[in-house]
Amino acid sequence: MAGSSFRFRPAALPLQGALLILLLAPASGAAPASAADLSAAVTAATAELRQGWSADPTTAALPFPSVRLLPPDASVQGTCNPKAPARVPAPRAAYCASSGEVLLDRELLEKPYGRAQPSVGRALVTYWIATALAERLLPAAPEGAGSDPLRILQATCRGGVLLGASPARKSFPDATPLLIAARSAYGDRYATAVGSASQRGYALLTGLGATATSSCDAAEMAALVKGAVPDRALLATIEQLPPPDRAYGSLLGAINSQCKPLLPKRPCPRKQ
């Protein structure tokens, strides 16, 4: 958006250099989040995302799925479809079509949530719920289908759109914690099944209106799987970032000013 002002935008630095400098900034000294607060974080994130769901004309007429944090020792797949082949990697959250719920794996979420900085812990929970809600909007996956990078990236992108439409974006005026959550969602060894860390980060930023990719459509995300995006320099910059658990700092001023929200008549999350 021409003329928009963004916080911490370093005018003398090109986009990619600014992004690296800001994201390479050391972590703050805040105390790690407590795993005991996980249930409260799920409740808070769900309430915020529900508002975004109701505000978006593409989802307002659809029932909002219930969100359930599973008890210890219960997995998402074991609860939703125990007869299907095991998904590798196991998701921390997913939409269960048979019950119409978003299911969250308590054990897979507790450890990263408990050891994270508070803002990153909240972003982790919000990211997983948002992407699982976005799965509700995608065509049903074939019975017993394994992980699919295209589907993962579409859900990540549409989850970003949902985040941008909800009060959750005000909880993260700096989008860096959300980018960390997207990049750290799966281990690098699973990249062929779920997309690389940089692809997930780019997909999330696309949903937030911060890339040159214009939509979350299958064709756009298929191009991302191949690395054929309009702004390859940004994708390359995300690839150069340090491991997600060390990527702290301000992201807002580093993303290009051509912010184009994917929801009509809604400001980008990065706009002041």
Regions flagged by a language model, labelled:
Residues 104, 127-140, 156:
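Active-site recognition of the HExxH zinc-binding catalytic motif
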Residues 190-271:
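Pan-zinc metallopeptidase signature
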Residues 29-35:
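Boundary at the C-terminal end of the N-terminal hydrophobic targeting segment
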Residues 1-10:
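N-terminal secretory signal peptides that target proteins for export/translocation
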Residues 14-27:
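Bacterial N-terminal signal peptides
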Residues 110-127:
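Short pre-active-site segment immediately N-terminal to the catalytic Zn-binding motif
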